[in-house]
């Protein structure tokens, strides 16, 4: 048996806990996101740009959920499969493609939602005397586009096209070229977990994407706070407190999502690529375990998003409430 294979040994966390967690996340995520998509597509008549962003976010979430069974079976059976077996290739290709493509799409869409929420604030204040000429021009020529449903629809389609156009060739290259160059005997091995040169470069670019998304959200929140302070020193904003509170809540929710789910992953990934080059099997196993746990944490956001939608969109919350209220009323009447 190859040295690289024997060096990588899955712990109970990888072989037992992660498969169970991925299956549970898949069940919760498929149910919640399918219900959310049904509401967005059939129950909400007049769709705003936020609804379009959230609908595409749900699509990305469902794609992540579709990868979870592959990830689960990989961690459960990967140490028993042969490296060149069909099931190893299929799980590796579909799991990697679905997981990473949809994660990057989700990140970009969350960034656009943050910009859209800030644009809502600027729309409310673009006619105020306290708004600078720069802010009026910035809103008039750029920000307001993020609130236009047509622009939101086209932007989301472009995002899917660009991300898939990058991820698919990298995944195919890794599966066809890089994955066949190693001498590993088992599916769960060093090369599968670490990736080769091209896939590592792609991983670092992906980490940069996460940093970019986080920067966009932080910038939106900082701009919001700065704008709010300026407005408060110049005029009364009591009549607009609800709008400001709503925008602040949305930006905070997105910030928390990125901090909890994606920030640990993005911080650890460069460290992982630097430290894994040392010939220390115990340290390598710890690094791989940590990477897999943080990847699972990042993908968990896709399953919890339907709860987040209740905080991001009042129409979705109201529609869901009415749906369950009517359902309960009909159920009570049938027993009346």
Swiss-Prot record:
Task: State which ranges are Cytoplasmic (membrane side).
Answer: 33-55, 116-156, 219-251
A GO molecular function term, named singly, is:
G protein-coupled receptor activity
Q: Which PROSITE patterns match?
A: G_PROTEIN_RECEP_F1_2
How this chain sits in the membrane, per its record, is: Multi-pass membrane protein
Role this protein plays: Orphan receptor.
Q: Which GO terms describe its cellular component?
A: plasma membrane
Could you tell me which InterPro entries the record lists for this protein? GPCR_Rhodpsn, GPCR_Rhodpsn_7TM, GPR82
Major place of residence = membrane
Work out whether the entry's keyword set contains Membrane. yes
Protein's name in the database: Probable G-protein coupled receptor 82
Family affiliation: Belongs to the G-protein coupled receptor 1 family.
Entry's localization field: Cell membrane
Superkingdom to which the source organism belongs: Eukaryota
Give each disulfide bond as a residue pair. Answer: none
Entry's Gene Ontology BP terms: adipose tissue development; energy homeostasis; response to food; response to glucose; response to insulin; triglyceride metabolic process
Glycan-linked positions: 3-4
Q: Which UniProt keywords apply?
A: Cell membrane, G-protein coupled receptor, Glycoprotein, Membrane, Receptor, Transducer, Transmembrane, Transmembrane helix
- State the Pfam families in the record: 7tm_1
Q: Which residues are on the Extracellular side of the membrane?
A: 1-11, 77-92, 178-197, 273-336
Transmembrane residue ranges: 12-32, 56-76, 93-115, 157-177, 198-218, 252-272
């Amino acid at each position: 048996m190859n040295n690289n294979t024997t060096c990588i040994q899955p712990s109970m966390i990888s072989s037992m806990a992660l498969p169970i967690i991925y299956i549970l996340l898949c069940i919760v995520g498929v149910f919640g996101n399918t219900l959310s998509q049904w509401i967005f597509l059939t129950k909400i008549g007049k769709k705003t740009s936020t609804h379009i962003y959230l609908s595409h976010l749900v699509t990305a979430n469902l794609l992540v959920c579709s990868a979870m069974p592959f990830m689960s079976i990989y961690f459960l059976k990967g140490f028993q499969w042969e490296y060149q077996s069909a099931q190893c290739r299929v799980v590796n290709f579909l799991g990697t493609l679905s997981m990473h493509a949809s994660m990057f799409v989700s990140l970009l869409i969350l960034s656009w939602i943050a910009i859209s929420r800030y644009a809502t604030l600027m729309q409310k204040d673009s006619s105020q005397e306290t708004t600078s000429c720069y802010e009026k021009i910035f809103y008039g020529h750029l920000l307001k586009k993020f609130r236009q449903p047509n622009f939101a629809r086209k932007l989301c389609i472009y995002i899917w096209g660009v991300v898939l156009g990058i991820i698919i060739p990298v995944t195919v290259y890794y599966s066809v070229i890089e994955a066949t160059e190693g001498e590993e005997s088992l599916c769960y091995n060093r090369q599968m977990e670490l990736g080769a040169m091209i896939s590592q470069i792609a991983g670092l670019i992906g980490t940069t994407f996460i940093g970019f998304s986080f920067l966009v959200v932080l910038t939106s929140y900082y701009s919001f706070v700065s704008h709010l302070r300026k407005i408060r020193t110049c005029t009364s904003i009591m009549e607009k407190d609800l709008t400001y509170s709503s925008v602040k809540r949305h930006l905070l929710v997105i910030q928390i999502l990125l901090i909890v789910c994606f920030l640990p992953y993005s911080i650890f990934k460069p460290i992982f690529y630097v430290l894994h080059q040392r010939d220390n099997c115990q340290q390598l196993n710890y690094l791989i375990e940590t990477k897999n746990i943080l990847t699972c944490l990042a993908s968990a956001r896709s399953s919890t998003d339907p709860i987040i939608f209740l905080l991001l969109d009042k129409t979705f919350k109201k529609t869901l409430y009415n749906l369950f209220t009517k359902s309960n009323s009909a159920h009570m009447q049938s027993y009346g």
